Amino acid sequence: SFSVNPAVDILQHRYMEKVAQNNRNFLNRV
């Protein structure tokens, strides 16, 4: 992420981790 605000970087990182986890759960269900 290219944000100047470190808080936004943290939020983006957490969001990407959540998305990745959701993708893994989806793949496991299929």
Swiss-Prot record:
Per UniProt, the keywords (alphabetical) are: Amidation, Hormone, Secreted
Q: Where in the cell is it found?
A: Secreted
**What's one GO MF term for it?**
hormone activity
* Further details from the record: Prolonged ingestion of diuretic hormone 2 by M.sexta neonates results in reduced food consumption, slowed growth and reduced developmental rates. A high percentage of neonates fail to molt into second instar larvae and death usually follows shortly thereafter, suggesting the possible use of this insecticidal peptide in plant protection.
Q: What is this protein called?
A: Diuretic hormone 2
Family according to the record = Belongs to the sauvagine/corticotropin-releasing factor/urotensin I family.
Matches recorded under SMART domains:
CRF (SM00039)
Q: Which InterPro entries match?
A: CRF (IPR000187)
Modification type Valine amide: residues: V30
Q: Which GO terms describe its cellular component?
A: extracellular region
Q: What does this protein do?
A: Regulation of fluid secretion.
